[in-house]
A protein has these predicted regions:
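Class I S-adenosyl-L-methionine-dependent methyltransferase catalytic core
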Residues: 1-146, 152-198
């Protein structure tokens, strides 16, 4: 039987090679964090992969939806990064198949300037508040979330905070280890079993 979840909430690689460290130093005012190099975002997922993922869920929220071929949507989620004038994007878009109007979330995330300082462990990590906002837009009857591009587990943490079960998949072992550490800091109650095994 095929695994199914109520909601797909993910931030797939866009194929922009951010993992190569090409944007390590955009300014001389601060030293950018070195995340190492990898090839996980050299290519975006195929159209087939996205269709298959969408088939596994009733509701979908896909960050970077503007980079992919997806059906028309009346509900885009817009994350306004409150950046000011610089060479980073002013906002990020999430495509959805939700039945509501476009929604905007204002949350500063600009290098050292962050609305709520959060340790960044992944080059394309979304703030927890942004994932919580996105998940709050899903229908209230959502009880399970799938994130097949989990990174360091931000979607899983947002689901936990909302009392929603979640499944995360990540191909990079180091990010899985980081996600385990983050999740151990937010321990789930498994009926007396509180250890998360890596």
């Amino acid at each position: 039987e095929t695994l199914r979840c109520d909601c797909l909430l993910c931030d797939p690689p866009y194929g922009l090679s951010e993992a190569k460290g090409k944007n390590k130093s955009r300014t001389k005012l601060a030293v950018a964090k070195d995340y190492g190099t990898s090839d996980w975002d050299d290519e975006p997922p195929s159209d087939f992969d996205l269709i298959r993922l969408r088939d596994l869920t009733k509701w979908q929220i896909i960050f970077g939806g503007n980079y992919f071929v997806l059906p028309p949507s009346k509900c885009w989620l817009v994350w306004d990064k409150v950046n000011g004038a610089n060479d980073f994007a002013d906002c990020e878009l999430a495509w959805t198949n939700l039945d509501k109007a476009v929604r905007i979330f204002h949350y500063m995330w600009n290098g050292m300037l962050k609305e709520n300082p959060e340790y960044r462990m992944h080059p394309t990590q979304k703030p927890l508040a942004v994932c919580k906002f996105a998940l709050s837009m899903a229908p209230k009857d959502v009880t399970s979330v799938l994130d097949p591009y989990m990174g360091v587990g931000t979607t899983i943490l947002a689901a936990k905070a909302a009392g929603i079960s979640a499944i995360g998949v990540e191909r990079e072992e180091r990010y899985c280890a980081d996600a385990v550490v983050r999740l151990q800091q937010e321990v789930f109650d498994f009926g007396g079993v509180n250890d998360i095994q890596s």
